[in-house]
């Protein structure tokens, strides 16, 4: 689960992570009031008005602006709130800005990057720091890897003090700045572990001319599998920032990711789903989604899966690929038949069932009287999808 920048900063602040003072505003008038409050209480020369969407690259897209007065803050908020912001992460459709963060301006001397996430290749959390603040870390890793330090964190002992100091040394900091950076990194790690985050990224981490070390931006992603331990974070979810198909799928506990193709996929198991998508691509098609109905697919989940796939108007054919290990193929076949009778299945549906009770399932489909196209293997299924698309 992703959250907004201001929400992430509120959480980090509770763990002692230094962040600038900021106030969220849902209207231009609220933005003006927030700016007045910051100017009066902090005496800062400028405030920063930042569009709040679940995407990076806001600054380059015009979603981050400076204001020197409450009146200017009002004008900028009028421009931002309600606009569709398009960045390299939003795609061409962009995201609507529904709120802004009004934040005190910083007297920046240096910019860095610091992030903590899970390294799946080593099954350890990894602390990453870079001297290239404000840059995409993937680009830094590819083009100038010498400017990126990765420190593997032992899951038994957690991050040690010497590792935080190593990171601060790598950034070239000294004296008070060094000590502040060590404290910052330590607090960030404690927050990351305590909230069961999948990612805690500060880009940029800034050092001010006064020697302060603060998170100018903050990106927090939660591990969905651990959210049951943090019910206080459920209210932070903003479904307006999520794909509506994915939101609907999550209500039925379906693992769904929308793509930009025209072949709907319903598969049990993530590995088989990815293999199915590859075969569709190799046959000349383009998958419209990733949909894993799970190892215990029931008629209800199959029906919900069909509804979600059919709600995507780009879908021109559907491929159902089920391997019956834990799940019985006849149960899935029953779900397909039931769904087809309830829903207007006006698209060609190619079905490949293998494994437990597959012959029974195939007979059920044959006897159903429905216009379902049977496939004998994955390659055959992908080919029949292409034939169905060509005929439509």
Curated annotation (Swiss-Prot):
Binds 1 Mg(2+) ion per subunit. Its cofactor is Mg(2+). It catalyses: succinate + ATP + CoA = succinyl-CoA + ADP + phosphate; GTP + succinate + CoA = succinyl-CoA + GDP + phosphate. Substrate binds at residues 268, 325-327. Its EC number is 6.2.1.5. HAMAP family: Succ_CoA_beta. NCBIfam families: PRK00696.1, sucCoAbeta. This is Succinate--CoA ligase [ADP-forming] subunit beta. It comes from Pelodictyon phaeoclathratiforme (strain DSM 5477 / BU-1). The gene is sucC.
């Amino acid at each position: 689960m992703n959250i907004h920048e201001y929400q992430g900063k509120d959480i980090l602040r509770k763990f002692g992570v230094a962040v600038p003072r900021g106030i969220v505003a849902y209207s231009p008038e609220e933005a003006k009031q927030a700016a007045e409050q910051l100017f009066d209480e902090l005496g800062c020369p400028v405030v920063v008005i930042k569009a709040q969407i679940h995407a990076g690259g806001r600054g380059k897209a015009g979603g981050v602006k400076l204001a020197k007065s409450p009146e200017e803050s009002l004008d900028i908020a009028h421009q931002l709130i309600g606009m569709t912001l398009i960045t390299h992460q939003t795609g061409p459709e962009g995201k609507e800005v529904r709120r802004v963060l009004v934040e005190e301006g910083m007297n920046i001397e240096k910019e860095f990057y610091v992030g903590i996430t899970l390294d799946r290749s080593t099954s350890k959390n990894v602390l990453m720091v870079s001297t290239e603040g404000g840059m995409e870390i993937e680009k830094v890793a590819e083009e100038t890897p010498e400017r990126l330090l990765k420190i593997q964190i032992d899951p038994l002992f957690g991050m040690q003090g010497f590792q935080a100091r190593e990171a601060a040394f790598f950034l070239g900091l000294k004296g008070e700045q060094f000590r502040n950076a060590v404290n910052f990194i330590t607090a960030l790690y404690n927050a990351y572990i305590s909230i069961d985050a999948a990612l805690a990224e500060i880009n940029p981490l800034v050092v001010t001319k006064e020697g302060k070390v603060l998170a100018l931006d903050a990106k927090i992603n939660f591990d969905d599998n651990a959210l049951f331990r943090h019910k206080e974070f459920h209210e932070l979810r903003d479904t307006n920032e999520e794909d509506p198909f994915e939101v609907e799928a999550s209500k039925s506990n379906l693992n769904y990711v929308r793509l930009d193709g025209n072949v709907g996929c319903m598969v049990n198991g993530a590995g088989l789903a990815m293999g199915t998508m590859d075969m569709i691509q190799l046959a000349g098609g383009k998958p419209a989604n990733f949909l894993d109905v799970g190892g215990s697919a029931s008629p209800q989940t199959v029906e919900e899966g069909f509804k979600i796939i059919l709600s995507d108007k780009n879908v021109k054919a559907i491929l159902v690929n089920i391997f019956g290990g834990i799940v019985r193929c006849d149960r899935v076949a029953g779900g397909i038949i039931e769904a087809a009778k309830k829903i207007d299945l006006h698209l060609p549906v190619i079905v490949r069932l293998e494994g437990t009770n597959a012959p029974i399932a195939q007979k059920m489909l044959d006897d159903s009287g429905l216009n379902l196209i049977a496939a004998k293997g994955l390659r055959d299924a992908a080919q029949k999808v292409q034939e169905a698309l060509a005929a439509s």
